[in-house]
A protein has these predicted regions:
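Structured C-terminal helix/loop/strand segments within mature extracytoplasmic catalytic/sensor domains
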Residues: 28-43, 148, 152, 195-225, ...
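Bacterial N-terminal signal peptides
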Residues: 11-23
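Mid-domain, small-residue-enriched loop/turn segments at the edges of structured enzyme/sensor domains
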Residues: 130, 143-202
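Conserved catalytic neighborhood of penicillin-recognizing serine enzymes
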Residues: 108-144, 152, 183
Length: 313
């Protein structure tokens, strides 16, 4: 089964039709990195599912992508806009970073979450919820934050007001039941998800001080086995992973020696629904991350040490 790649807009460069083994060229815009575009196109061929990728150097503006503006499930990447909306509520005085909150069993989202193991009536500061949501991808903490930030409708209003036309919270959001049935908790595009991290990096999501702390949160990921595994551990990276049965995803902004770059990789309709490291979606994310490091940092070659996979969660 060949990789299914949806058509890109003409402004993005290449129309691919892997199902028929053919590709029709379209004019490349000035900022498209033709070499990187070719490398990404080659990398996704044969993938058993649909792939979306967006990559951009923040220094040069050069970019490339595959299905960069197509709609994909966010899975746990939706926790990035939830984080932004939570900090926006803090900025407006509706929440406080240090305020104490009481956990009740009714908040539990069944799974392996740290917060879900807490006793009823336990107390937590808001900043521990944001930490758990981003660092360990705790679902119970994230759904609690979604409610504290005003719910999915309020988060979606922030996204709409700030120019994000596709990225939306679907779960527990009235009127978005059909979207939830198709995409799950949230939906986005590779380009929009990358842009969310860029807004935070540039201090333009909420205010500069809030953006700084959000960025610190995003650089503390527990999940180092995919995109992060292909990057030197001494290089700072802000990232968020996501996964559901038929989709794997990760967005990362790399503070590389030669200049920042951002990328987002999302799959959908994956044939491989296994949860082990060889999952085809995880493998693709690792390959994209390694390719981008080599492309943007040719003077700083790096590869994981033999056996590094033994020390990944």
């Amino acid at each position: 089964m060949g990789g299914r790649v949806e058509a890109l807009p003409r402004s993005f460069g290449v129309l691919l039709a892997f199902g028929f083994g053919a590709a029709a060229a379209a004019p490349l815009p000035a900022q498209t990195d033709a070499h990187l575009q070719h490398s990404l196109d080659s990398l996704v061929q044969g993938f058993h599912g649909t792939v979306g990728i967006y990559a951009q150097s923040l220094k040069s503006g050069h970019r490339a992508g595959v299905n960069a503006d197509s709609v994909f499930p966010t899975a746990s990447m939706i926790k990035v806009p939830i984080l932004i909306a939570t900090f926006d509520a803090m900025e407006r005085g509706q929440l406080d970073f240090r305020q104490e909150l009481t956990y009740t069993d009714s908040l539990l989202y069944a799974g392996d979450d740290i917060l879900g193991a807490a006793r009823d009536s336990s107390r937590f500061p808001l900043n521990k919820l944001t930490l758990l949501s981003i660092t360990t991808s705790d679902n119970t903490a994230s759904l609690w934050l979604q409610a504290l930030a005003g719910g999915g409708a309020a988060i979606n209003q922030w996204l709409s007001d700030h120019g994000f036309s596709v990225t939306r919270v679907n779960s527990r959001t009235p009127g978005r039941e059909e979207n939830r049935a198709q995409y799950g908790w949230g939906q986005t595009t590779p380009r929009e998800m990358a842009d969310l991290l860029v807004r935070i990096r540039e201090g333009k999501a909420v205010g500069p001080a809030a953006s700084e702390e959000m960025y610190r949160h995003l650089t503390r990921s527990y999940w180092t086995g995919e995109a992060l595994s292909q990057l030197p551990p001494w290089v700072q990276v802000a990232s968020k992973v996501g996964a559901v049965d038929h989709s794997r995803s990760e967005v990362a902004l790399v503070n590389a020696p030669s200049g920042d770059y951002v990328f987002s990789v999302i799959t959908k309709d994956q044939a491989d629904t296994t949860w082990d490291p060889p999952n085809e979606g995880w493998v693709l994310i690792r390959k994209v991350s390694a390719l981008l490091w080599s492309h943007f940092e040719p003077r700083h070659p790096w590869h994981p040490a033999p056996g590094a996979e033994r020390f990944k969660p």
